[in-house]
Amino acid sequence: MLDLIQTRRDLHQIPEIGLEEFKTQAYLLDVIEKLTTGKDFVQIRTWRTGILVYLQGSQPERTIGWRTDIDGLPIVEQTGLPFASQHQGRMHACVHDFHMTIALGCLERALEEQPKNNLLFLFQPAEENEAGGMLMYEDGAFGDWLPDQFYGLHVRPDLKVGQIATNTHTLFAGTCEVKIRFKGKGGHAAFPHEANDALVAASYFVTQVQSVVSRNVNPIEGAVVTFGVFQAGTTNNVITDTAFLHGTIRALTQDMSLLVQKRVKTVAEGVAAAFDMEVEVELKQGGYLPVENNPALARELMDFFDEKDGIELIDIEPAMTGEDFGYLLSKVDGVMFWLGIDSPYALHHPQMSPKEEVLAIGVAAVSSFLKKKAAE
């Protein structure tokens, strides 16, 4: 039987960033091959650093998918744990080591007997940086294994051990990276009339773009426009010719995201026109679409967990954080949910150290749900 805690600790020591998860993939494949030995209803495929494990059903009517992400973050770990990261500047601060371990535990249980329906376990790379789910889908990695229903989880520090939370609508916002560069004309600070100050134009844009959320977004739906980087100029007595802004757009539906993207671009172009200068606007959403749960499937999952002993189900509000599972759920009906890990530290914190008793709880809960879906 798989030692969940040791497996998690092994994975915790070898975090790798997106599409560089070579040791992680090798470790996972070794475990998967041991678990699947002698199981003639199992097939395994790889895609770059990703892995797909397909359990052929005995009388399949559909394919049920379970997705886990496998990448780490470029963070220096500060937990002081004896099994801390052995990769300098890399850490499983988003707790994907837990996600992988739970998936392996569920795979082990699913292999006890051939399921009626097909089951697909996806070990997906590059959730944090490259939208690996989108890359796999667009590259045809699923082939004829593409699920009819897709499920997945993410751990959450502010939920207690034993709590599961989701809803019947949007769980994560869609995110879009924004880069804007104003191009004016540089000059001496004493002669502003001979220059065209990109810093002033960019500053004007920052104030004007605040109207997008306050005046273009339905307050009930919500959206966020935040610029965290503003770079302009090199010294105090020179008018700069360029100003660079780097920010993010977040919205709970794709329609709202597209509206906000359009308005941000329009405001930037309007400001540039008013100041008689050029502007470049780069909007990059990629695969980070809103994670929109299928209402009927979400209700089914919520009802199932609500009746499970040891599980407290919470109907939770959406989070404005992003998650690339949204892309796959835009192609396949499915559900994502939160699993409580009761940590004082937020996700991506260098001291993140979740409670390991969650592993057994997660495996028991998820495997029982997948068993139900596989038998329908």
From Swiss-Prot:
PANTHER family: N-ACETYLDIAMINOPIMELATE DEACETYLASE (PTHR11014:SF98), PEPTIDASE M20 FAMILY MEMBER (PTHR11014). Gene3D superfamilies: 3.30.70.360, Zn peptidases. One of its GO terms (biological process) is lysine biosynthetic process via diaminopimelate. The active site is at D69, E128. Belongs to the peptidase M20A family. N-acetyldiaminopimelate deacetylase subfamily. Its EC number is 3.5.1.47. The keyword Hydrolase applies. It holds the Pfam family Peptidase_M20. It comes from Streptococcus pneumoniae serotype 4 (strain ATCC BAA-334 / TIGR4). InterPro entries: AcetylDAP_deacetylase (IPR023905), Amidohydrolase (IPR017439), Bact_exopeptidase_dim_dom (IPR036264), Peptidase_M20 (IPR002933), Peptidase_M20_dimer (IPR011650). Pathway: Amino-acid biosynthesis; L-lysine biosynthesis via DAP pathway; LL-2,6-diaminopimelate from (S)-tetrahydrodipicolinate (acetylase route): step 3/3. It is an enzyme of class 3 (hydrolase). This is N-acetyldiaminopimelate deacetylase. Keywords: Amino-acid biosynthesis, Diaminopimelate biosynthesis, Hydrolase, Lysine biosynthesis. GO terms for molecular function: N-acetyldiaminopimelate deacetylase activity. Catalyzes the conversion of N-acetyl-diaminopimelate to diaminopimelate and acetate. It catalyses: N-acetyl-(2S,6S)-2,6-diaminopimelate + H2O = (2S,6S)-2,6-diaminopimelate + acetate.
